[in-house]
Swiss-Prot record:
The keyword Hydrolase applies. Monomer. Residues 16-241 form the AB hydrolase-1 domain. Gene3D superfamilies: alpha/beta hydrolase. One of its GO terms (cellular component) is membrane. The physiological role of BioH is to remove the methyl group introduced by BioC when the pimeloyl moiety is complete. It allows to synthesize pimeloyl-ACP via the fatty acid synthetic pathway through the hydrolysis of the ester bonds of pimeloyl-ACP esters. Keywords: Biotin biosynthesis, Cytoplasm, Hydrolase, Serine esterase. This is Pimeloyl-[acyl-carrier protein] methyl ester esterase. Belongs to the AB hydrolase superfamily. Carboxylesterase BioH family. Pathway: Cofactor biosynthesis; biotin biosynthesis. Its EC number is 3.1.1.85. It catalyses: 6-carboxyhexanoyl-[ACP] methyl ester + H2O = 6-carboxyhexanoyl-[ACP] + methanol + H(+). The keyword Cytoplasm applies.
């Protein structure tokens, strides 16, 4: 089955793909794509079920990957935010001819907390799932607030996220539920050692969804990767510290 996803392409140079997170769409990358298009050929996608791809649906990371493969550039730098980080990591693991370098942003190989592993408490994810069935617009708004919490520019961050989501068709509830299931169940920790391309992990020090301790734990699980912590950011460093964020990507691309 072919699944035509919505892509926007701008700029010239090395191919760079930007992948959004849960409940969002490609419009969250608008400022980032604009800034990076002076340095790269930037590809921004709406994942299946989101934005202008809202009529599509994918129930697993591999189904998302198959949809992306239809139009994704080969040998590109992949930048995945939050849930998009799982998507980009999956691409690097299973479709490596498409990925020359991997960047994860405020992401984790396992989002749900378990034992000593830090993350989102399973009951929070369960509550989100229950709320989603009742009122998915309100649930997305709560998630936006949760993402920005702790950031000095939280109010502005939420405003931009909200504008981005509302500027395109609302996500489909089926895909939102599938995404929450991925956040609750996917665990790529043991697979990280098999990533064969250079990897950069970017974090926000104030992030409540991907705690800073995850960055330290991953130094052991992915010792070959590089990591950088944005001091003033929560879950959306590409908004809170936009200039520094783009600088990290440009420097990593040229290394």
């Amino acid at each position: 089955m072919t699944m035509a996803l919505y892509w926007q392409v701008s700029g010239q140079g090395q191919d760079l793909v930007l992948v959004h997170g849960w409940g969002m769409n490609g419009a969250v990358w608008q400022q980032t794509a604009q800034a990076l298009s002076d340095h790269f050929r930037v590809h921004v996608v709406d994942l299946p079920g989101y934005g202008h791809s809202a009529e599509q649906h994918a129930a697993s990371l591999e189904e998302i990957a198959q949809a992306l493969l239809e139009h994704a550039p080969r040998n590109a730098i992949w930048v995945g935010w939050s849930l998009g980080g799982l998507v980009a990591t999956h691409m690097a693991l299973h479709h490596s001819d498409y990925v020359s370098k991997l960047v994860t942003v405020a992401s984790s190989p396992k989002f749900a907390a378990q034992g000593s592993w830090r993350g989102i408490q399973p009951d929070v994810l369960t509550a989100f799932t229950d709320q989603l069935v009742a009122d998915f617009q309100l649930t997305i708004e709560r998630f936006m607030a949760l993402q920005a919490m702790g950031s000095p520019s939280a109010r502005q961050d939420v405003k931009v996220l909200k504008q981005a989501v509302l500027s395109r068709p609302m996500p489909n509830p089926q895909s939102l539920l599938a995404g929450l299931t991925m956040l609750a169940e996917v665990d790529l920790r043991d697979e990280l050692q098999h990533i064969s391309v250079p990897m950069l992990r970017l974090y926000g020090r104030l992030d409540g969804l991907v705690p800073a301790k995850v960055a330290r734990d991953l130094n052991h699980l992915a010792p070959y990767s590089e990591a950088f912590m944005f001091d003033q950011s929560s879950h959306a460093p590409f908004m809170t510290e936009a200039e520094a964020f783009c600088q990290q990507l440009i420097e990593f691309a040229t290394r």
